[in-house]
Amino acid sequence: MKRPLIITALVLAFLGIFLYNAFDEVTPEEIENAPDWLSIEEAMIKAEEDGRLVIIDIFEVGCQFCRAMNRDVYPAPSTRAVIDRDFHPVKINGNSEETLTFQGVEMTQQEFANSLGLTAFPFTVIMDHNGTVIDSRRGYMGVQDLTQFMRNARDKASGLSDNSSG
């Protein structure tokens, strides 16, 4: 009678230790040279003031490609140079029930991500100060791919604003 109880207790203890270590590895860590991530509310206010675009990194806690972009791509000097010059960076947890306010509407981060067309993680969205999506892309992007994606979106947005003003 005691033997199954001891075995069950040992299995649960090992499972607890395993889960603790697994979640410890996926929790956010301080990354040197990481962008100064803003909330969507802050980014939209700043974009309205200075005309820069908003880049939104939609991630999932357990996503290894999301972690790789966070650790290796966003802090890269060439990526940071483009972000710092032309963008306000935002991070959204695509599975979070935490609320945010976008264009006066309160919703969960998950609802916001889905409203942007989320199909897979990571999902990167670039929008203007009005909340108009300029471009989006799903999946991992390396440094060159992300910087080119941002430059293309910036050029596309410049073309849109040139057309609307003339």
What does each of the following model-derived ranges do?
Residues 1-33:
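N-terminal targeting signals for export/organelle localization
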Residues 36-53:
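A short beta-strand-turn-helix
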Residues 48-49, 81-84, 116-119:
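Extracellular/periplasmic catalytic domains that process cell-envelope and extracellular macromolecules
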Residues 49-64, 89:
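Short active-site neighborhood of thiol/selenol oxidoreductases, capturing the structured segment around
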Residues 61, 88, 94-97, 129-131, ...:
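Solvent-exposed coil/turn segments that connect beta secondary-structure elements
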Residues 66-84:
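Typically the conserved alpha-helix immediately C-terminal to a functionally engaged Cys/Sec
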Residues 72-74, 114-159:
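Non-catalytic, surface beta->alpha helical segment in thiol-disulfide oxidoreductase systems
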Residues 90, 101-118:
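Short, internal strand/loop/helix patches
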